[in-house]
Amino acid sequence: MEKWMNLRDEDLTEETKTLISSLSSEKGYLGRNLCKYQGSWYYYNFLQGVLNFQRGFKPQDTDIIVASYPKSGTLWLKALTVALFERTKNPSHDDPMSHPLLSNNPHNLLSSSSPRLFSTHTPFHTLQVAVKDSPCKVVYICRDAKDSLVSRWHIVCRSLNKEEDRTILESMFESFCSGVCLFGPFWDHILSYWKASLEKPKQVLFMRYDEIKTDPHGQLKKLAEFLGCPFSKEEEKNGSLNKILEMCSLPNLSSLEVNKTGKSINGIEYKNHFRKGIVGDWKNHLTPEMGSKIDMIMKEKLKDYSEVWFENAL
């Protein structure tokens, strides 16, 4: 769904400009205007993309949509999904070097043939306008709020050719805490998909970044079963899971030439999407006070929901 979001402010229609004038508006951490639409905040050009998507996307029953809040493991989940379906297309793997993940970035592997793979950062209620009653499947990946924030900070700094600018981090932190940030508030975003996964367990799968890190085999099998392409006992015995996990590991993906030199449709260099990918790295960048404040906010926002859920998820 990247093509729907790859717009400029000059692409705004008169209808969208009129809509924006009626919406709540705030300044983002980089000084760009944000407006609130259907409960979430968007840059004006992103809102145009959302509107275009809601009106123009034609879902197919076999579509797979990978969803996440930005910098929560989207690329990793995309790679795993591509690898799962690729093994069903080419089970023999006669030429492992011909695998599409070795010559393309996961963000660029959006097949036009069935099953089609898409990705989005919009919350579920906004996505649902486009998919309506389609049985297409949605896989959501959730990451610790603090790690996600730090990861977004790094890619913003890299995109601006700045080295770990603390001023930007502090601005992003304040924006996160207020909820006024692109695709935010964070807590509403994850709750939209979590609720959907409870209401539609056969259509929406809620996955957690931390759990994929601690139990990669179990989570990969869970993903494969949800997508309708479970591993056979023979595949498990011959190490198919290990092969996929190794190929889709961040160290392996980041070492590929295409991910060192290529660019995404919006001009961001693929290499900027890769960093450590570890759990708990926020401790190296956020102060203990910042971490405590985010934890306090998340507990407050999730107080009406299962304590077990947010302890495991966040």
Swiss-Prot record:
UniProt record similarity statement: Belongs to the sulfotransferase 1 family.
Localization: Cytoplasm
Protein name as catalogued: Cytosolic sulfotransferase 3
Pfam families: Sulfotransfer_1 (PF00685)
Key words, A-Z: Cytoplasm, Transferase
Entry-linked PANTHER family: SULFOTRANSFERASE SULT
Positions of the catalytic residues: 121 (proton acceptor)
GO cellular component: cytoplasm
Binding positions for 3'-phosphoadenylyl sulfate per the UniProt entry: 71-76, 143, 151, 209, 275-277
GO terms, molecular function: sulfotransferase activity
Function: Sulfotransferase that utilizes 3'-phospho-5'-adenylyl sulfate (PAPS) as sulfonate donor.
EC number per UniProt: 2.8.2.-
Gene name of the record: SOT3
